[in-house]
């Protein structure tokens, strides 16, 4: 058995090596890929991302039976409306997320929601697999009680594959380690039998979160704003400064008076845009209301 496993491993490694030899990623092809993902999604690919790009896109080539990156690029550019464009974008987007990531934001959100009348609404601009918008909805549920039933979280992402996972609302139990036992019981169902070790979002929580595909570079955003709060965390780091400025400018009319904009720990929106000022740790308000 050990010999068989070792042989299989060698064959697998050999196959990967052969694939790399058959499918070289030239400098010209990498530059074109970088241009296309920037045009379509605003993502800036640094030179050190080349290996990541290769590893992700080579899967698409294998699936399509294409043996040259030039042929793949020709396929993309032959039809600007091809479904392969979405697969291309999905492959090159990065999705790092967790429940209650950057935890200091959520007490601020809770206090803000309690202080405001009416139906509280939030936009999560990069929902990924759902951990952020569900964390927002849980926070509102805990903070507002019965009033949370009228709150809405709008959750968007450019990657359609991660949105499917988000809508399914199924996670590993270990992914919820930042939740309290009460939150676990109140907002999730535990899997049994073949689903042991998994949890699913309860319908009451899922009903407050609306998922939709959205490209921040799109000319129009089909959103029901303005919002009491916008979460745009760890998104701008993938864009260049002109793109960052354009997006932040478009956030201004989408925030209600007194609204909050939440950023990632490595992002400084007040250095990018004069429209926002720093109210707290990576939390921004509108400068015109300062």
Swiss-Prot record:
One of its GO terms (biological process) is methylation. It is an enzyme of class 2 (transferase). Residues 18-289 form the CheR-type methyltransferase domain. Keywords: Chemotaxis, Methyltransferase, S-adenosyl-L-methionine, Transferase. Coiled coil: none annotated. SUPFAM superfamilies: Chemotaxis receptor methyltransferase CheR, N-terminal domain, S-adenosyl-L-methionine-dependent methyltransferases. One of its GO terms (molecular function) is protein-glutamate O-methyltransferase activity. InterPro entries: Bact_Chemotaxis_MeTrfase (IPR050903), Chemotaxis_MeTrfase_CheR (IPR026024), CheR_C (IPR022642), CheR_MeTrfase (IPR000780), CheR_N (IPR022641), CheR_N_sf (IPR036804), SAM-dependent_MTases_sf (IPR029063). It holds the Pfam family CheR_N. Gene3D superfamilies: Chemotaxis receptor methyltransferase CheR, N-terminal domain (1.10.155.10), Vaccinia Virus protein VP39 (3.40.50.150). Methylation of the membrane-bound methyl-accepting chemotaxis proteins (MCP) to form gamma-glutamyl methyl ester residues in MCP. This is Chemotaxis protein methyltransferase. It comes from Klebsiella aerogenes (strain ATCC 13048 / DSM 30053 / CCUG 1429 / JCM 1235 / KCTC 2190 / NBRC 13534 / NCIMB 10102 / NCTC 10006 / CDC 819-56) (Enterobacter aerogenes). The gene is cheR.
């Amino acid at each position: 058995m050990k010999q068989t496993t070792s042989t299989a491993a060698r064959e697998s490694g050999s196959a990967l090596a052969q694939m790399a030899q058959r499918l070289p990623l030239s400098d010209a092809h990498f530059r074109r890929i970088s241009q296309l993902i920037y045009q379509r999604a605003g993502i800036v690919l640094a030179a050190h991302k080349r290996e990541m790009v290769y590893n992700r896109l080579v899967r698409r080539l294998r699936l399509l039976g294409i043996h040259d990156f030039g042929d793949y690029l020709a396929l993309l550019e032959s039809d600007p409306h091809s479904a392969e464009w979405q697969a291309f974008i999905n492959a090159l987007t990065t999705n790092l997320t967790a429940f209650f990531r950057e935890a200091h934001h959520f007490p601020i959100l809770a206090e803000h929601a309690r202080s405001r009348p009416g139906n509280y609404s939030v936009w999560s601009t990069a929902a990924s697999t759902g951990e952020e918008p569900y964390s927002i909805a849980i926070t509102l549920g805990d903070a507002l009680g019965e009033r949370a039933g009228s709150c809405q979280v709008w959750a968007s992402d450019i990657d359609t594959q991660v949105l499917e996972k988000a809508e399914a609302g199924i996670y590993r139990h270990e992914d919820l380690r930042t939740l309290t036992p009460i939150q676990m019981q109140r907002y999730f169902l535990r899997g049994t039998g073949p689903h042991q070790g998994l949890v699913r979002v309860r319908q009451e929580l899922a009903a407050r979160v609306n998922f939709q595909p959205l490209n921040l570079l799109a000319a129009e955003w089909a959103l029901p704003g303005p919002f009491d709060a916008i979460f745009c965390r760890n998104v701008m780091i993938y864009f260049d400064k002109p793109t960052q400025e354009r997006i932040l400018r478009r956030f201004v009319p989408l925030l209600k008076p007194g609204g909050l904009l939440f950023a990632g720990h490595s992002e400084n929106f007040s250095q990018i845009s004069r429209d926002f000022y720093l109210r707290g740790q990576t939390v921004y308000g509108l400068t015109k209301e300062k």
